[in-house]
Structures are given as C-alpha cells and as structure tokens.
C-alpha cells in the first residue's frame, strides 16, 4: 500500500475461490506473516505471495492484513482505477451480504462521513496542485545553495563566512527535506512517474539520502502512526521509551537499555544532534547496500560529488567532511523538533484497529497556522490534514482544516492545535512522564 505503479503480473492468482464469500472472522484469521488477506470496498484479496512485490513495501501492506484497508488504499494510491486492474488476480471474493462493511465494530456513520468529506474536498479542487508553489519552493532551495557557494567565491572560507554558509546550507537541506516529502507522497504531479523521479532528485542529489529508504519507513508511519511494532518512528527502545503503555510494559519486564527516567535530559544529547548525521546517515547506507539499491546509491553519490566539487577547493576533503557533518548537525535539530512535536506527546499504543480518522487523530496534532510556521515546518503544522490525506498538496491544508475540524466535533474526536513553543515543551514533558512510568514499573511491579 503506497507508491502506486504496476502491482502484479497477469496470470498471478490469489489462492481460494474467486467468487467466494467470507465473514470478517475468516478474514481476520488470515493475518499472520505467511497468510495475509485484506478487504478493500468489501472485496477480499489474498496478498500473501504478492506483498513481497508491493511497490510501497511489504511491511506497510502487511500492517493492514486481516482488516478493512479501504481508507488506507484511498490515501496512498492516486490512480485507484489503474491499480485495481492489477488487483484482480488477487481477488478471492467478497464479504457475505450479512457482514458490515467495517471491521472491529467501527462506527459506520463516522466512516461514511469521512469518505464523503474526502469526496467533497476532491470536488473543491483541494487535491489539485499549484505548479507555481512548488516551482518557487524548489527555486528558494536552489537559491540558498547558490548563495552559500557565492559567499565562498567572493569572501573566502573564514570562520564567519563558514558559519554563515553552514546556516544557509542547513536551511536549504531542511527545506529540501520538506520538498522531498511532497514528491514522496505523490502530491505534486498528475503522473506519479514524475513524482518518483523528482523524489529521487531531491532526496538523492540535493540531500544525499535514499528515496526507497524513506518510502519504506514513512509509509509505515502513515499507515499505522504511533502504533507499536508497526510505526518505525516509535521503535526507539534502545534509547527512549514513549507513551504511557510501553514504559510500563518494559518496566515490568525489567528492560533497561538506558536510564529512561532521565531520558528527558539525555534526549537533548542523543536526539536532535545525532539523528541525521549519525543514525539516519548510517541507516541509509546500510539499507542501500543490503537491498542492492544501486540506483538510489548513484543518486546518493551524486550529492557528495557535487558537494566536494564546490567545497573541497576551499576546505579540502577532510574539511568538507567536517562541513557536511556540521550542516547535518544543524539540520538535525530542525528536523527532530518539527517532526516529533506532532507525535511524541500523542497516544502511543498497540494496534486498536480504529477507523482511519480516529487512528490518525489519536496520533497527531496541529500547530498554529502562520506564514512562518508553514514555512518552518514544511506545512507539517497541519499534521492532521496531512495524515488524513497524504496526497493532498500541502498548500491546500489550511482550506481543508475547518472541514476536518467540523467532522471531528460532530463525533467528539479531539482536534488538537498547539503553539509552536508549547508543542516543543510537550515533547520534553512527555519524555519525562514516560520515564517516570518506566521507573515506577521497573522498581515496584
């Protein structure tokens, strides 16, 4: 789920009766690693063998097995009619007429209203892109890159100039990070092929990372946000314990990789400074090597070739490596505080099989709308709208927001909006609370 593209070869068959009828109990019994069914629009599909070739990755689609994946399917696939052609060989049948369309006793009215909201937003043109927005956005990133080189050409590599160009490069890298995010979600072009190509250019050539690595992690996060064992962004046991449930579970099991009761303090040392220059950088290289992803590796190398071409004449090879590391160090602070402010303070739990709207609202919150916040966060201050509609161009989030809030109010679902500083403080408060829960369970349970 996620990524679109050709899904299966003609003639590949799902096992079972193509015209069969099934109950939810039967579907839910096929949710193991080696036996996977799912439901989309009441049709039952066997994805067991094919999941390995899913364009969005095996894990993201496997996370939805045994349940209704209709809303996830709509969220991740821009051309559903095209994709459905390749799903036909996987079709087993349909739910029995007596079965509801929703699983796990989900609120049918809420789900129907959410789907109506999506159709209404589509009819309002909120899934249509403004080309000028993205042209100007890419332009300001390239301008920052050009200014940093121009500083060197005209003023040399003194300390003040080096610090100034480091800030310019960190800003361009952070903004390129938000832009690759847009292309990765297929939210810019009508033809997803161009999104994929631009994604590789932005994340590979402009940032020195891997598109496939990012997709594999990020689609899982979107499909099951803040859900243990399914969202890789909350799998931090070796460093942090998050939420209210996991700290108690780990404390009872006497798991102690770190003094978690102090995590709100050491977070400032191991989180914002090191995530990009150390963990992500090494993980990108490891993933490309293990997956033999030579295309992304070529894009990755093109970034470093360009960087050394411009900067090694002034800093040398070693000095250029120091410069890259310092730029990533600066960018990492920006990235961590922005990406975690919407999620760490929210619910983190095992999968409760909630409907799409409820699941996303439990795991996300918004930050106040302003021109600065929009630019600074790459419009991730509208995290709720982004998670509900990941293919919506971000310049339309502010128009969708009032309608999403109205639907949430109708069903008593909390729609949280915070100030920027408040959201950052909530990260630290949440880490402190989780650490205290772990310590209490570790010592007394």
From Swiss-Prot:
Membrane association type: Multi-pass membrane protein
Superkingdom as given in the UniProt entry: Eukaryota
CDD domains reported in the protein's UniProt record: Delta6-FADS-like
Stretches assigned to the Cytoplasmic side: 1-131, 180-265, 328-445
One Pfam family named in its UniProt record: Cyt-b5
EC identifiers of the protein: 1.14.19.3
Cellular component terms (Gene Ontology): endoplasmic reticulum membrane
Reactions this protein catalyses: (9Z,12Z)-octadecadienoyl-CoA + 2 Fe(II)-[cytochrome b5] + O2 + 2 H(+) = (6Z,9Z,12Z)-octadecatrienoyl-CoA + 2 Fe(III)-[cytochrome b5] + 2 H2O; (9Z,12Z,15Z)-octadecatrienoyl-CoA + 2 Fe(II)-[cytochrome b5] + O2 + 2 H(+) = (6Z,9Z,12Z,15Z)-octadecatetraenoyl-CoA + 2 Fe(III)-[cytochrome b5] + 2 H2O
Keywords from the UniProt entry: Electron transport, Endoplasmic reticulum, Fatty acid biosynthesis, Fatty acid metabolism, Lipid biosynthesis, Lipid metabolism, Membrane, Oxidoreductase, Transmembrane, Transmembrane helix, Transport
BP GO terms, sorted: unsaturated fatty acid biosynthetic process
UniProt-listed InterPro entries: Cyt_B5-like_heme/steroid-bd, Cyt_B5-like_heme/steroid_sf, FA_desaturase_dom, Fatty_acid_desaturase
Domain notes: The histidine box domains may contain the active site and/or be involved in metal ion binding.
Name of the molecule in the record: Fatty acid desaturase 2
Origin species: Tachysurus fulvidraco
Origin organism lineage: Eukaryota, Metazoa, Chordata, Craniata, Vertebrata
């Amino acid at each position: 789920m996620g990524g679109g593209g050709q899904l299966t070869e003609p003639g590949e068959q799902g096992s079972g009766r193509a015209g069969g009828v099934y109950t939810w109990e039967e579907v839910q019994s096929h949710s193991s690693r080696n036996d996977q069914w799912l439901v989309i629009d009441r049709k039952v599909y066997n994805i067991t063998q094919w999941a390995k070739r899913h364009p969005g990755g095996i894990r993201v689609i496997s996370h939805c097995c045994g349940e209704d994946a209709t809303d996830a399917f709509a969220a991740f696939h821009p051309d559903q009619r095209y994709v459905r052609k390749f799903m036909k060989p996987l079709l087993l049948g349909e739910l029995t007429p007596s079965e509801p369309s929703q699983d796990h006793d989900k609120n049918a009215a809420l789900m129907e209203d959410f789907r109506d909201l999506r159709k209404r937003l589509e009819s309002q043109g909120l899934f249509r892109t403004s080309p000028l927005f993205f042209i100007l956005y890419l332009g300001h990133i390239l301008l920052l890159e050009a200014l940093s080189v121009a500083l060197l050409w005209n003023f040399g590599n003194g300390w003040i100039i080096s610090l100034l160009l480091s800030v310019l490069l960190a800003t361009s890298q952070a903004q390129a990070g938000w832009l690759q995010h847009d292309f990765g979600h297929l939210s810019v072009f009508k033809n997803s092929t161009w999104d994929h190509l631009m994604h590789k250019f932005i994340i590979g050539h402009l940032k020195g990372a891997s598109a496939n690595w990012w997709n594999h992690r990020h689609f899982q996060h979107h499909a099951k946000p803040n859900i243990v064992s399914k969202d890789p962004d909350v799998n931090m046991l070796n460093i942090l314990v998050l939420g209210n449930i996991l700290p108690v579970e780990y404390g009872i099991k006497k798991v102690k990789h770190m003094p978690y009761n102090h995590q709100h303090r050491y977070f400032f040392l191991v989180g914002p400074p090191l995530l990009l220059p150390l963990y992500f950088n090494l993980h990108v290289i490891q993933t490309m090597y293990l997956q033999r992803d030579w295309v992304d590796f070529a894009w990755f190398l093109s970034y470093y070739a360009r960087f050394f071409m411009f900067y090694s004449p002034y800093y040398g090879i070693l000095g250029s490596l120091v410069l890259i590391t310092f730029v990533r160090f600066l960018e990492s602070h920006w990235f961590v505080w922005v990406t975690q402010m919407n999620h760490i303070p929210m619910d983190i739990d095992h999968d409760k099989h909630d409907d799409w709207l409820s699941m996303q609202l439990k795991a996300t919150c918004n930050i106040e709308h302003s021109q600065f916040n929009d630019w600074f966060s790459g419009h991730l201050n509208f995290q709720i709208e982004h998670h509900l509609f990941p293919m919506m161009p971000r310049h339309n989030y502010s128009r969708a927001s009032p309608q999403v809030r109205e639907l949430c109010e109708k069903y008593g679902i909390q729609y949280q909006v915070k100030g920027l500083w408040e959201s950052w403080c909530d990260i630290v408060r949440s880490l402190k609370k989780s650490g205290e829960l772990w310590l209490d369970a570790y010592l007394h349970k």
